[in-house]
A protein has these predicted regions:
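Conserved glycine-rich cofactor-binding loop
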Residues: 9-10
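Conserved glycine-rich Rossmann-like NAD(P)H-binding loop of the short-chain dehydrogenase/reductase
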Residues: 24-38
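Rossmann-fold cofactor-recognition segment
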Residues: 43-59
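Conserved NAD(P)H cofactor-binding loop of Rossmann-fold oxidoreductase domains
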Residues: 79-85
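Substrate-binding pocket helix/loop in short-chain dehydrogenase/reductase
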Residues: 87-88, 95-97
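Catalytic loop of short-chain dehydrogenase/reductase
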Residues: 124-152, 157-158, 162-165
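C-terminal helical subdomain
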Residues: 166, 173-174, 189-212
Length: 212
């Protein structure tokens, strides 16, 4: 399989790279080049992992062709995420734009850019969402922008699930609860989640690769 994954320099994304690079070709898109290089060096089959350290929203067809060549894409995992924990009255437009650019627009943009490659492979898109972005679930103070961005991603997933059937592309979202990632620790110092990034990566593998 050829798998493209965003937000893979740490956390769940990095664990997925470790897992999938054993038997698949993995193409990572993330901004932290230093962490990506360290991740590649740590892999047993490091030749199976290629990366580009660039903002998703700056990518275009030319830069993707330079990165991916002419390969088909079997799986796209839109995993990149940004969490800001800030009271509603303190939120500025810049906060909103940063979060929406990463959590929503990045997934929208990359899914569109890769649609032809995914269609040729009869592939799948997995959007990593959050329970905070699901209607009717518990919501928490300070997460108005984050939860709203994940809600937008969830609705986008539902729309694309229907719209991309004619392209033979399956689209799903996984709404995560708390996972003990660096992002969670930065937003909620001292909070301990029950699920590790490795455990979540193994679960994602079970539905994306083993379940495909």
């Amino acid at each position: 399989m050829n798998i493209v994954i965003t937000g893979c320099s740490q956390g769940i994304g990095a664990e997925l790279v470790k897992l999938w690079s054993t038997n698949h070709r993995v193409f990572g898109i993330s901004r932290n080049r230093e962490k990506l290089e360290m991740l590649k060096l740590s892999l047993e089959n490091h030749e199976n992992f290629s990366f580009i350290s660039e903002s998703i929203n700056d990518l275009n067809q030319d830069s993707l062709t330079e990165f991916l060549g002419q390969i088909k894409v079997d799986v796209l995992v839109n995993n990149a995420g940004l969490l800001i924990n800030k009271p509603f009255l303190e939120i500025q437009y810049e906060d909103y734009k940063r979060v929406m650019d990463v959590n929503f627009w990045g997934a929208f943009h990359l899914s569109k850019l890769l649609l032809d490659r995914l269609s040729k492979a009869k592939g799948q898109i997995l959007n990593i969402s959050s329970m905070g972005g699901v209607n009717g679930t518990s919501k928490f103070p300070g997460l108005s922008v984050y939860s709203s961005s994940k809600g937008a991603l969830t609705i986008l997933t539902e729309c694309l699930y229907e719209e991309l059937k004619e392209y033979n592309v399956r689209v799903n979202a996984l709404a995560l609860g708390a996972v003990q990632t660096e992002m969670l620790d930065q937003a909620f110092p001292g909070y301990k989640a029950d699920t590790s990034p490795k455990q979540m990566a193994e679960f994602i593998d079970s539905i994306v690769v083993k379940g495909s």
